[in-house]
């Protein structure tokens, strides 16, 4: 038997906590016997004193085990359970293509996703732009979709890592969100509760990233890879660029439209293709579905070329109560804003930098994201035809097309878009789309 205050005192004094002490505290959070003040105190001591690798693994496992851990054995699946998690960005629509692509190659992807957070878009919000799409199927339906389709993208239920929800809510109001051991445990508790064989992390770097610097992004990626592997889930991470919008669009319906066009081959943004392919390659290699990178890329290209990936996406949409002919008729189902027109720069120049976070907040301001958890979402608004770094813009070449539902919103966000994009006379040095692969 432990006392919560003694566990806090021990960590406050810089001593490592045992696995038993960590489990006691986390179960106390779940069972509401540890107070909000005690959660805040422990979070702050961890923020200042950090945690060793064994402590980080113990914290993650305790949070995972605070609720249901999915078990797929009874389904006798003939392939690995694999997933991807992104730290979030703008125009980061990779999940919608990646899940079907990997499923078409023989993987099973039980993806539990989130809503938009701050300036970053949420996969669930994007999918809810599809009429009827059910992000909360019951457990039996979820398992059946995974068995029959190979991929399902759903929201987190209250039974998965419930201690994390209360812990995170306290961190959010006590300035302890940006602690690497706590971020790591929060992300991985939910992912490991999926019962995965392998995981790939997409950790963003740059002006639209969650972590403000490259070194902090790298630290987070290494922490997640170390803890996840320590917890028995084969995990790698890619550091990918978020110094500009990843896709050609940012918003909900507009990104779903881009995802379908990507899968059918109608249009594939080169940067989006590079990141999506690289993440899929990691999933195929970690899951034992390919011999090497060349083999993985060939398999993935084949399911794009022969239409299997698009077919799997369509089957997932139908299985989750969306339209059965969505892939064929997406334009007749997705909402359209009343006003769509281009925004031009006030002078001619070459785009040298982008405040990607500000562009994400422009989508939120249009109604495409939430300022408060209870805010409704406008699925029709957003940005499309985003200009890239290094593009020369003038009176003919716009910065973006803004989709809004009234002229005032359009005018207001046109100013935000102009202010977020820096023009110069010289073409900027091209930055890599993928900075680094982390395996340990």
Swiss-Prot record:
Pfam families from the UniProt entry: Glycos_trans_3N, Glycos_transf_3, PYNP_C
Domain of life: Bacteria
EC supergroup of this enzyme: transferase
Coiled-coil ranges (or none): none
GO CC field: cytosol
GO molecular function: 1,4-alpha-oligoglucan phosphorylase activity; thymidine phosphorylase activity
Cross-referenced SMART domains: PYNP_C (SM00941)
Reaction(s) the record says it catalyses: thymidine + phosphate = 2-deoxy-alpha-D-ribose 1-phosphate + thymine
Keyword Glycosyltransferase tagged: yes
The entry's keywords: Glycosyltransferase, Transferase
EC number: 2.4.2.4
Biological processes, Gene Ontology terms: pyrimidine nucleobase metabolic process; thymidine metabolic process
UniProt similarity note: Belongs to the thymidine/pyrimidine-nucleoside phosphorylase family.
Summary of the function given for this chain in its UniProt record: The enzymes which catalyze the reversible phosphorolysis of pyrimidine nucleosides are involved in the degradation of these compounds and in their utilization as carbon and energy sources, or in the rescue of pyrimidine bases for nucleotide synthesis.
Subunit text: Homodimer.
Xref: HAMAP family: Thymid_phosp (MF_01628)
Protein name (database record): Thymidine phosphorylase
Species this chain originates from: Yersinia pestis
């Amino acid at each position: 038997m432990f006392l919560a205050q003694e566990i806090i005192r021990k960590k406050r004094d810089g001593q490592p906590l045992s696995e038993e002490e960590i489990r006691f505290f986390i179960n106390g959070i779940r069972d509401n016997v540890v107070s909000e003040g005690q959660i805040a105190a422990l979070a702050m001591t961890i923020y200042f004193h950090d945690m060793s690798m064994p402590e980080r693994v113990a914290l993650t496992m305790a949070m995972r085990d605070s609720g249901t851990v999915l078990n797929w054995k009874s389904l006798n699946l003939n392939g690995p359970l694999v997933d991807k998690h992104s730290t979030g960005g703008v125009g980061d629509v990779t999940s919608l293509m990646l899940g079907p692509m990997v499923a078409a190659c023989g993987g099973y992807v039980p993806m539990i996703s989130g809503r938009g957070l701050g300036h970053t878009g949420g996969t669930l919000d994007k999918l809810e732009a599809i009429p009827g799409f059910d992000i909360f199927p019951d457990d039996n339906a979820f398992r059946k979709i995974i068995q029959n389709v190979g991929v399902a993208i759903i929201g987190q239920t209250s039974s998965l890592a419930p201690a994390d929800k209360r812990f995170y809510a306290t961190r959010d109001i006590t300035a302890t969100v940006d602690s690497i051991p706590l971020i790591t445990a929060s992300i991985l508790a939910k992912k490991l509760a999926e019962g995965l064989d392998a995981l790939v992390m997409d950790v963003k770097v740059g002006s639209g990233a969650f972590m403000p610097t490259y070194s902090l992004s790298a630290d987070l990626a290494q922490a997640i890879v170390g803890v996840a592997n320590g917890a028995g889930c084969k995990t790698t991470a890619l550091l990918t660029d978020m110094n500009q919008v990843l896709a050609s669009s940012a918003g909900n319906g507009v990104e779903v439209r881009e995802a379908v066009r990507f899968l059918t081959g109608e249009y594939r943004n080169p940067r989006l293709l590079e990141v999506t392919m690289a993440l899929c390659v990691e999933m195929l290699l970690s899951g034992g579905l390919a011999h090497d990178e060349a083999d993985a890329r060939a398999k993935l290209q084949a399911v794009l070329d022969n239409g299997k990936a698009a077919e799997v996406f369509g089957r997932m949409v139908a299985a989750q109560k969306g339209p059965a002919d969505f892939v064929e008729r997406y334009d007749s189902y997705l909402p359209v804003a009343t006003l769509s027109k281009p925004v031009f720069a006030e002078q001619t120049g070459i785009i040298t930098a982008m405040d990607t976070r500000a562009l994400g907040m422009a989508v939120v301001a249009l109604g495409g994201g939430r300022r408060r958890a209870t805010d409704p979402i406008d699925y029709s608004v957003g940005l499309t035809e985003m200009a890239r770094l290094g593009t020369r813009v003038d009176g003919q070449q716009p910065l973006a097309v803004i989709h809004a539902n009234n002229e005032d919103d359009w005018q207001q966000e046109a100013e935000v878009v102009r202010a977020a994009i820096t023009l110069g006379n010289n073409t900027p040095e091209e930055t890599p789309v993928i900075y680094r692969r982390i395996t340990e």
